[in-house]
Regions:
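Hydrophobic, well-ordered secondary-structure elements that form the walls
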Residues: 132, 168, 189
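Solvent-exposed beta-hairpin/edge-strand motifs
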Residues: 150-173
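Short acidic/proline- and small/hydrophobic-mixed sequence motifs that coincide with surface turns
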Residues: 140-144, 163-164, 177
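Glycan-recognition surfaces
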Residues: 1-72
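Carbohydrate-binding surface patches
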Residues: 60-63, 68-70, 114-156
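C-terminal beta-strand-rich structural cap/linker in extracellular carbohydrate-active enzymes
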Residues: 179-200
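Generic recognition of flexible, low-complexity loop/linker segments
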Residues: 47-48, 117-122, 181-182
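Catalytic cores of secreted or luminal carbohydrate-active enzymes
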Residues: 55-113
């Protein structure tokens, strides 16, 4: 079951962010078998650049939204074959982000912090991991420092404190690391997304 939560989305950054802002506050209504629908993806449409397209897709995956492509998929093909250099195709086929979107727990992301143009949103996953997204809503590059133990303070996320640190999987670069904090420099209108797992 799904229900539209907003008017039709438009292929511009203002509309993407406005739609996100409404839906991130509706997290408690999403769950297994029922989803908020913030409308189709505008990835690859209009004047959205690659960072904005990646952020748009990241946010919809974090919101457990239905992923319905709104672009012309013929642009994904070159000489009758998938164009492996097509940046939009790379974005919408990111298997790590799709796995977050389609996680069987079905819970949507909750905004856990908002500071200096950075939204920090997180959602619990069925295996006990947490998907964590750092979203730069500002029109300039921002730096952020986030203590991962802060995730354990919100019962909604259900993650255990891990004194020895956390395993981090960057879902866009596919890089893996361990640590207790995230220090990131994020370009304007961009996201960084991690899958976080206690090392205990």
């Amino acid at each position: 079951n799904l229900w539209r939560t907003t008017p039709d989305i438009q292929a511009n950054w203002k509309s993407v962010v406005g739609t996100y802002e409404i839906n991130v506050n509706l997290f408690k209504y999403a769950g297994k078998g029922n989803w908020n629908d913030p409308d189709m993806l505008e990835v690859g449409n209009g004047k959205l650049d690659d960072n904005e397209n990646r952020a748009h897709f990241s946010l919809w995956c974090m919101l457990a939204a239905p992923l319905m492509l709104g672009n012309d998929i013929r642009s994904f093909v070159s000489n009758g074959m998938p164009d492996k250099d097509n940046e939009t195709l790379k974005i919408v086929t990111n298997k790590h982000m799709i796995a977050v979107d389609q996680d069987s727990l079905g819970k949507s992301a909750k905004r856990i912090k908002k500071e200096s143009g950075i939204d920090i949103i997180a959602r619990p996953l069925s295996n006990g991991d947490v998907a964590l997204c750092l979203f730069n809503t500002a029109s300039s590059t921002k730096s952020v420092n986030f203590k991962l133990d802060d995730l354990t303070k919100d019962p909604y996320l259900g993650i255990e404190e891990s004194p020895s640190g956390y395993e981090l999987h960057d879902l866009w670069t596919d890089e893996r690391s361990t640590g207790t904090t995230i220090n990131a420099t994020i370009p304007k209108h961009s996201t960084v997304v991690y899958r976080v797992k206690p090392t205990i």
